[in-house]
């Protein structure tokens, strides 16, 4: 796992290439994934640091990161990883969570009532992790991503999908709804609600708000805070991140 750690660290801080002029678009910091894909032969690194508290348990991700690469006009491939520190009542675990590999394909552009559409598929690889976080099974996921342009400064996005859980191989259904509004050319506000639901179980619902700040056309800073709602444990979280397009 040392090689993965070295690659992750190098990727987060290797911001020396020149980016193209198009303004950066990211999938972070919220759960709703954008239908936008990375420009061909460009790399985008989306990294962040998060803190989550549920009762007396605390979890840190320092950092989490997504590496996205545009393979051709409408498609990208991606690798996701995170170094996790898990504080429980009488024990602590730390290490790299299972590596996630995937791809996104842009299907249609926004036109009239038809939203921007894309398909995202990814899978977590159980053995590409430190011992404390290895999982018993692969965990594939597929989502349909959509976004409506309400105005030049406002958008409404949503995802629908299913993920097969690593512990049980049972399906877990995913739904997200996100609205954003650009206050200026550099500052955007985002509000979101999302949930996960297994058959015969109450959905785990969450709400969050975020602020995105464009430092340069190819660099974005974000901060997000949220909490579980309704039939969910008392859980609060905060995250700050930096994204860079090469």
Question: Where do the PLM segments sit?
Answer:
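Cleavable N-terminal export/targeting peptides
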Residues: 1-27
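Transmembrane beta-barrel domains of Gram-negative outer membranes and organellar outer membranes
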Residues: 21-246
């Amino acid at each position: 796992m040392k090689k993965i750690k070295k690659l992750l660290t190098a990727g987060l801080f290797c911001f020396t290439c020149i980016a193209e002029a198009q303004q950066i678009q990211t999938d972070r910091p919220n759960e709703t994934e954008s239908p936008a894909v990375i420009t061909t032969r460009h790399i985008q690194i989306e990294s962040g640091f998060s803190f989550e508290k549920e009762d007396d348990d605390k979890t840190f991700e320092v950092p989490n990161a997504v590496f996205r690469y545009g393979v051709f006009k409408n498609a990208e491939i991606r690798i996701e990883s995170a170094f996790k520190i898990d504080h429980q009542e009488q024990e602590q675990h730390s290490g790299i969570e299972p590596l996630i590999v995937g791809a996104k394909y842009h299907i249609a552009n926004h036109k009239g009532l038809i939203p921007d559409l894309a398909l995202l598929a990814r899978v977590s690889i159980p053995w590409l992790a430190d011992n404390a976080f290895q999982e018993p099974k692969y965990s594939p996921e597929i989502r349909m991503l959509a976004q409506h342009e309400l105005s030049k400064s406002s958008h409404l996005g949503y995802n629908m999908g299913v993920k097969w859980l690593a512990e049980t191989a049972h399906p877990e259904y995913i739904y997200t709804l996100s609205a954003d509004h650009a206050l200026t050319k550099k500052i955007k506000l985002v509000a979101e609600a999302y949930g996960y639901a297994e058959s015969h179980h109450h959905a785990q619902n969450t709400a969050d708000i975020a602020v995105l700040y464009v430092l340069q056309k190819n660099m974005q800073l974000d901060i997000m805070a949220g909490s579980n709602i309704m039939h969910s444990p008392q859980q609060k979280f905060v995250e700050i991140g930096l994204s860079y397009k090469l």
